[in-house]
Design a protein with these regions (language model features):
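Active-site helix of classical SDR
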Residues: 124, 161
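Conserved glycine-rich cofactor-binding loop
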Residues: 10, 17-19
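SDR active-site lid
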Residues: 178-247
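Substrate-binding pocket helix/loop in short-chain dehydrogenase/reductase
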Residues: 100-101, 105-110
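Residue(s) in the substrate-gating loop at a strand-loop-helix junction
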Residues: 145
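The beta1-alpha1 cofactor-binding region of Rossmann-like NAD(H)/NADP(H)-dependent oxidoreductases
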Residues: 42-43, 63-74, 106
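Conserved glycine-rich Rossmann-like NAD(P)H-binding loop of the short-chain dehydrogenase/reductase
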Residues: 31-47
Length: 277
């Protein structure tokens, strides 16, 4: 299902207060789409709303915790009452945690999985039925990660959640094959955002020097969220099943299918160089 013309479409984005979510809101708005933006805090959304409306389209903002199913159901009901079924749903909200598995406690696991995986599940569960009923074409973008395509050391919980998002999206794609709602799995590579160091936390065992090295690597090698957002727009317009975006994303995806051993060797070498190991 392609949606080449986004003018007047309703695009809902979770985690839209910063990073990829904010960039996506602006990118779709530049194409003439109306934006429904949510984040766990309302304050950053106020700035996004001003930026979006300056482009001549409408922007609704809501504070919601995607990990809370009751809150997400209420959010969906409010959105449907305001604009009806959305044309594009982008389940983007996510957090991260940095630290070797055996050197980190498990306290962060439930929250991270609830946001990264269940946030996607809740979004799909409470928005897709109306999308199906309204007819198509419509599209859901579930933001996974290249960390869901290769074994990322020091990011066990994050990688597990993103592997799960990718798997869930593949199954959902099959289940919705007879509808007019398409599913796109978005796999960003090295993106220069603050999610690793501020998205959830860092294990006490991780030294400041390692964090600094990682930040420097992302600044030097990473692309901006705007690159990801532009690729997401194209994925919707062209009806892509998977959106590999940012440095390393395409290489990792195809290299894993060629040789898992090569992926492991390359991952270990890179992880040592940037401070993941």
């Amino acid at each position: 299902m392609t949606i080449p013309d986004l003018r007047g479409k309703q695009v809902l984005i979770t985690g839209a207060g910063s990073g990829i979510g904010r960039a996506a809101a602006l990118a779709f708005a530049q194409c003439g789409a109306h934006i429904i933006a949510s984040d766990i805090q309302l304050a950053p959304l106020e700035a996004v709303k001003k930026e979006v409306e300056a482009l001549g389209v409408a922007c609704l903002i809501h504070a919601v915790d995607v990990a809370n199913e009751a809150a997400m159901k209420e959010y969906a009901d409010r959105v449907h009452a305001q604009v009806g079924a959305v044309d594009v749903l982008i389940n983007n909200a996510g957090i991260a945690y940095l630290g070797l598995f055996l050197h980190s406690d498990l306290d962060h696991w439930p929250r991270l999985m609830n946001v990264n995986l269940m946030g996607v599940v809740h979004g799909c569960r409470h928005f897709i039925p109306k999308m199906i009923a309204a007819g198509g074409p419509r599209r859901v973008l579930n933001v996974a990660s290249s960390a869901g395509n290769y074994p990322a050391p020091s990011m066990a919980a994050y990688a597990a959640s993103k592997y799960a998002v990718a798997g869930f999206s593949e199954v959902l794609k099959m289940e919705l094959a007879q509808t007019q709602v398409g599913i796109t799995t978005v796999c960003p590579g090295i993106i220069n955002t603050a999610i690793v160091t501020t998205g959830a936390g860092v294990a006490p065992s991780v030294p400041a020097s390692q964090i600094a090295k990682l930040q420097a690597y992302y600044v030097a090698k990473g692309c901006t969220p705007e690159v990801v957002a532009a690729d997401m727009v194209r994925a919707v317009q062209k009806g892509q099943d998977i959106c590999l975006t940012g440095p390393g994303a395409t290489l990792v995806y195809h290299l894993k299918r060629l040789s898992l051993k090569l992926v492991r060797m390359a991952t270990i070498a890179t992880a040592k160089r940037i401070g993941y190991l």
